[in-house]
Curated annotation (Swiss-Prot):
Residues 1-11, 74-112, 1043-1057 have a biased composition (Polar residues). One of its GO terms (biological process) is chromatin remodeling. It comes from Saccharomyces cerevisiae (strain ATCC 204508 / S288c). Its main location: nucleus. PANTHER family: SUPPRESSOR OF TY 5 (PTHR11125), TRANSCRIPTION ELONGATION FACTOR SPT5 (PTHR11125:SF7). This is Transcription elongation factor SPT5. Residues 382-415, 533-560, 584-615, 799-832 form the KOW domain.
Length: 1063
């Protein structure tokens, strides 16, 4: 593309100097004079007259090749001629020009254009080409081609030089890049080559014209002015852009630089510091943590600081390199010292008390930012007149006022309300008769009262010294205007969250006791804000801010912010809790939630300046307290967390009482005499646990009464109730039918009778008469069902109660006692030896009968339903051998079956075949050769043939007291079953004749069979077996020489061996 592209560039188009040139195809149509002239004027705001004449001439006369060559070959006109020709063109522009004049003008304009082209070569690239100008230039394209080649080469060289000079200072504006991402596109040289090829292609096709044809477009003076104006405009724009950039940078620094520093300083004050500033550098000295006594941190910091100043003054220029000393409230028992070496710290801390220099720790670098992070200190700066509380001594918890502060801030002088007893409780030495003062203690301290010099003079004059009318010294302590002035260490004083009550503040008021409520409210405002709690629904009033005096209702609360719906506002607003105050009205029921009267309740009487006065339901006195310490409540009854209604409390070593009205600190009680009184919480020694108390009494009928039994009065109003407690000869009873004194009354046990006693309920279930041997001995032989003891029901009672036990665990192992109480797995045992009660696991006890006997464990006791084994008397302790026979055994041996041994036993559980009848004892045998189911004696007695076993002595003696001689009846003489004999002679079950052992009716005949001769149980013996018990008929038939039960002998079962499997 030619450098000489377009000279018709207006001032307005100069702003588009960076835009790409517009390519317009060459127009083949010939335009008339008027159209060409109009288009030329519209194409730019600044157009030279030479360009206008050239456009008119070229639009009317087609270009000729020969004429163009001649015009180029002519010498250039001087500058004056060019200006004259331009003037002539202006004068002749109104009329039509002739052909010769037109040719002359064309030649002159082309020469003038050549002069201006060299100066405008660098600016032609930057100027966009207008559409109409390109159309007008198309007619002159052929004329430029007719110039000489030498002129073209010279012009091109000059233009290239000028282009190089102009392109050097020109710089493109750098595109703003992202500082974090590399998003710059790479541009290759191939794209430039492609653009050059496209331009050459467009030139060949005629869409882009060369600048050679534009020599006639502008004259030298107009082009020079344009160039000067354009350059001046460029300079102005560059200067303006630089000024704008500097001004913008200055504004940014002023606007944001100042605010950022403010924000940084504010953030630093709030405790925020960028972490990069907290990190230690290479030159940072090490920090060591040194152990010290807890609570002495601040005091040690002050001591070490003083020591550092003293050492620096003493050592002069050679100072100890201690850079800093500090402590953190979060890390108790440790101070931190910054020094370059460990030896410096050891030398510096040597000799300082309460510092354990051997226990020091180097702080790691990673923990230094957290250690050095600034935090708001929670320490309260003490000032004269501020309130504090004392931490120790007899004044522990008392409110005090700061009077003076020492210079080193280690001690404070406090104004305290004294607690003095003036020697009332001092002891007197009996030998020397001198007063021995007792040191006051916190448990026995006197109530707070102002110092009374009259009382001190009367009771303890020796320790009183008067300095003036207002100042006294008593026991080496100063009292001014009745107040004690005493010095305390700063660590013995509590300075945080002090919330004094109105009563405490009244003691520090004037002599008349008046208190300025406004000053009180201001003094405790911060302390109250720390504990004040607002709940949704509380009515409040705004104290500070734009909405001061507005009232509303709390809708939501957070830690420090409360959302309030104010009256007259639709949108809820948020306020700090410290700017709010609760609202109460006379008649509201309130409860104290903070302070000394916490838990008290009452009815609001008066509200004045944030102070609420209400009538306490406990003390029936007026109490004044700040509004934010109250809460509106529906239940006006305040109770204590330690004592409740109907609790039995101990007032002294001998007096007890029952609480009939429980409050926070005041209680109404009824004592054992029935007197109702009001006491304080401090008057109660302890609470009696009635669930574990083992006290009892006896009613008018002699029945035992215990706690929990229901009783009724025998005389009077016959009040009925449940026993709460038994004290000596009085019973505390509570009734649901009585309203007075919460249903509690006191009655003597001799005037009541038990209605539902536990012992009565147990006695009704057990029939002890059935266990009396004397009553049982008068009864007939009991049956098996009659003998079985009834199963006793536990009825909810512990089976171990009242049992005699032996301890199996260490400590009291082997000792006997009786179980008095059982609570879960623990049993209270009263020892027989020491008359002492101990508590022990009930599974570690062995349970016995009261008379002795075999012991069992607790599990066995439960399985036996509380029954313990009976004690054995006399021969019953002898056990039977294991080879015991069911029938008779060898002579001289003692045998038993089912625990039946020989001897005399009066009990039913040991059936030993003596005089006592034994039921269902199939196998008891006597000594000698007595047989039991085939011999003469069947129940252990001795007989000779027909002797019965139901009596023992004599051969014919009756077992039930009768005497017989063989044939007599064993049930008292004469036969009771039809004839004379039933168990010894002929049975009357089949024959009615008189028999003395003739024949048996049990299946066969025998000589003397019934229970003595040949047995008829399954066999038939006609050989008249010996009457001494020959052959047995149990499944075998014998001549009498053998027993039917594998027993061999020549003797009868009356006197021989037993027939039950033994020899």
């Amino acid at each position: 593309m030619s450098d000489n592209s377009d000279t018709n560039v207006s001032m307005q188009d100069h702003d588009q100097q960076f835009a790409d040139p517009v390519v317009v195809p060459q127009s083949t149509d010939t335009k008339d004079e008027n159209t060409s002239d109009k288009d030329t004027v519209d194409s730019g705001n600044v157009t030279t007259t030479e360009s206008t004449e050239r456009a008119e001439s070229t639009s009317n006369i087609p270009p000729l090749d020969g004429e163009e060559k001649e015009a180029k070959s002519e010498p250039q006109q001087p500058e004056d001629n060019a200006e004259t020709a331009a003037t002539e063109q202006v004068s002749s522009s109104n009329g039509p020009a002739t052909d010769d004049a037109q040719a002359t003008l064309n030649t002159d304009s082309s020469e003038a254009n050549e002069i201006v082209k060299k100066e405008e070569g660098s600016d032609e690239r930057k100027r966009p080409r207008e559409e109409d100008t390109k159309n007008s230039d198309g007619d002159t394209k052929d004329e430029g081609d007719n110039k000489d080649e030498d002129d073209d080469e010279d012009d091109d060289d000059d233009d290239d030089d000028e282009d190089d000079d102009d392109e050097a200072p020109t710089k493109r504006r750098r595109q703003e890049r992202n500082r974090f991402l590399d998003i710059e596109a790479e541009v290759s040289d191939d794209e430039d080559e492609d653009e050059d090829e496209e331009d050459s292609e467009l030139v060949r096709e005629g869409f882009i014209t060369h600048g050679d044809d534009e020599d006639d477009e502008a004259s030298a003076p107009g082009a020079r002015r344009d160039d000067r104006l354009h350059r001046q405009l460029d300079q102005d724009l560059n200067k303006t852009s630089e000024e704008d950039a500097q001004r913008l940078a200055k504004e940014l620094r002023e606007r944001y630089g100042r605010s950022s520093s403010k924000q940084y300083r504010a953030a630093a004050q709030d405790g925020y510091v960028p972490q990069r500033f907290l990190l230690p550098s290479v030159d940072t000295a090490t920090i060591w943590g040194v152990r010290c006594r807890p609570g002495k941190e601040k005091e040690l910091i002050r001591k070490l600081l003083k020591k550092k100043f003293n050492l620096d003054r003493a050592m002069g220029k050679k100072k100890l390199k201690i850079l800093s000393i500090f402590q953190r409230d979060n890390y108790t028992g440790r101070i931190y010292i910054e020094a370059p070496k460990q030896s410096v710290i050891e030398k510096f801390c040597n000799g300082v008390p309460d510092i354990y220099i051997s226990q020091k720790l180097l702080i790691p670098v990673q923990e230094l930012p957290l250690l050095l992070k600034p935090n708001k200190s929670d320490d309260v700066a003490l000032e004269e007149g501020s309130y504090v509380r004392i931490k120790r001594g007899i004044y522990k918890g008392d409110l005090a006022m700061v009077d003076q502060i020492s210079e080193n801030n280690l001690e404070v002088m406090l104004k305290i309300v004294p607690r003095l007893d003036y020697g009332k409780f001092d002891e007197i030495d009996p030998t020397t008769q001198q007063r021995k003062s007792r040191r006051p203690t916190f448990a026995h301290r006197a109530p707070p009262q102002l110092f009374n010099p009259t009382m001190a003079l009367r009771l303890d004059q020796a320790n009183l010294y008067k300095r003036d009318d207002r100042h006294f010294t008593y026991k080496n302590e100063d009292y001014i205007d009745g107040y004690l002035y005493k010095s305390f260490r700063i660590q013995h004083v509590e300075t945080k969250n002090i919330q004094p009550t109105v009563e405490e503040l009244a003691r520090f008021g004037s002599k008349e006791g008046a208190v300025d409520l406004t000053s009180v409210s201001q003094s405790i405002k911060k302390a109250q804000a720390a504990k004040v709690t607002f709940q949704p629904g509380d009515r409040i009033e705004v104290l500070n801010g734009e909405q001061r005096g507005s009232k509303g209702i709390v809708t939501r609360t957070t830690k420090d912010i409360a959302t309030i719906k104010l009256n007259g506002f639709t949108t809820p607003l948020e306020f700090p809790i410290s700017t709010l105050r609760k609202i109460f009205e006379p008649g509201d029921h309130v409860t104290v939630i903070n302070g000394e009267h916490q838990g008290d309740a009452g009815l609001v009487l008066m509200v004045e300046q944030g102070q609420v006065t209400f009538m306490s339901t406990q003390t029936s006195r007026e109490v004044t307290i700040t509004a934010n310490n109250l809460s509106k409540s529906i239940d006006t009854t305040a109770t204590s967390s330690e004592y409740a209604l109907h609790d039995i409390v101990e007032l002294s070593a001998k007096n007890v009482a029952c609480i009939i009205q429980a409050g926070h600190d005041i209680f109404k009680v009824i004592d054992e005499t029935g007197k109702v009184s009001t006491i304080t919480k401090g008057s109660i020694l302890s609470k009696i646990n009635t669930a574990r108390a083992r006290v009892s009494s006896v009613d008018a009928n002699g029945n035992e009464i215990k706690i929990g039994d229901t009783i009724v009065e025998k005389v009077g109003s016959r009040r009925e109730g449940q026993v709460l407690y038994i004290q000596t000869q009085q019973i505390f009873v509570v009734s649901k039918k009585i309203v007075e004194n919460a249903g509690v009354f006191v009655v003597n046990p001799s005037n009541v009778e038990a209605v539902a006693s536990k012992d009565n309920m147990l006695s009704n279930k057990m029939d002890l008469s059935k266990m009396n041997p004397e009553i049982i001995s008068k009864m007939g032989p009991p049956s098996s069902k009659t003998f079985q003891q009834p199963i006793q029901s536990r009825g909810g009672r512990e089976v171990a109660l009242g049992k005699t036990v032996r301890i199996r665990s260490a400590g009291y192992k082997g000792q006997l006692g009786i179980v008095k109480d059982v609570n879960g797995d623990k049993a209270t045992v009263e020892l027989h030896s020491k008359n002492k009660h101990i508590t022990i696991d009930k599974h570690k006890l062995t349970y016995y009968n009261r008379e002795g006997g075999e012991g069992i464990t607790y599990d066995e006791l439960v399985n036996r339903r509380g029954r313990v084994p009976q004690a054995r008397m006399g021969p019953s302790y002898v056990s039977a051998p294991r080879n015991m026979a069911t029938g008779g055994i060898a002579a001289g041996a003692a045998a038993t079956s089912s625990g039946l041994s020989g001897g005399m036993t009066p009990g039913w559980s040991s059936f030993d075949g003596g005089k006592t009848p034994a039921v269902n004892a199939h196998g008891g045998s006597g000594g000698g050769g007595v047989s039991s189911w085939g011999g003469a004696s069947t129940w252990g007695g001795q007989g000779n043939g027909g002797a019965s076993a139901w009596g023992g002595a004599g051969g014919g003696a009756s077992a039930w007291g009768g005497q017989g001689t063989g044939a007599t009846s064993t049930w008292g003489g004469a036969s009771a079953w039809g004839n004379k004999s039933s168990w010894g002679g002929a049975s009357t079950w089949a024959s009615g004749g008189e028999s003395n052992g003739a024949m048996s009716t049990w299946g066969g005949t025998g000589d003397r069979s019934a229970y003595g001769g040949a047995s008829t149980w399954g066999g038939n013996n006609n050989n008249k077996s010996t009457r001494d018990g020959g052959a047995s008929a149990w499944g075998n038939q014998d001549d009498g020489n053998r027993s039917a039960w594998n027993n061999q002998g020549n003797k009868s079962n009356y006197g021989g061996n037993s027939t039950w499997g033994g020899h």
